[in-house]
Amino acid sequence: MEIEKIVLKDGWIRFIPTFLNEDFANQLFEDLQQTIQWQQGEIVLFGKKHATPRLEAFCADDQKSYGYSGQRLITHEFTKELNEIRQKLTLEIGTSFNSVLLNLYRTGNDSNGWHADNEPELGKNPIIASLSLGATRRFDLKHNTTKEQLSFHLNHGSILIMGGELQHHWKHQIAKTKKVNEPRINLTFRNIQ
């Protein structure tokens, strides 16, 4: 398994382009589209409510709760498929996770603007493992102070892991694009304190 580790100023990233084999990734992608209870939430930006520009779901152990930008997500139990992925992650990267935020980007018009995963319930220096299924999308990072930028093309079956102080010093996004018309599912595994 090819692993690219990138040490950044104020954090690190690991990128594994073939974390899942294609057959398993294809089946998981189809299963999640059909079995997950997707919802479109509302977030508060600059005092105004907006529909999230993607669909979401949240699964966690022990009814752990998670929210951001003025919304709390409904907590569901881990499915069999999500548990399999979680166990594989634990074996491969040596970190265990108690929750996963799922995002369904229906087309290139769905997005996730500049943000950091720095909510208090994630702890001081969270490790976030982001698994991609479906359409390839560009993932951008930007340093808060130096404005240095870095981009990855997150392909079907790949995983990007963020750690160290990254969430304190960098923001990331999935920008809108007219080049993509197919859906993408992103699973962001994390630990809720």
Regions found by a protein language model. Name each.
Residues 1-193:
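Non-heme Fe(II) oxygenase metal-center motifs and adjacent flexible, charged/small-residue loops
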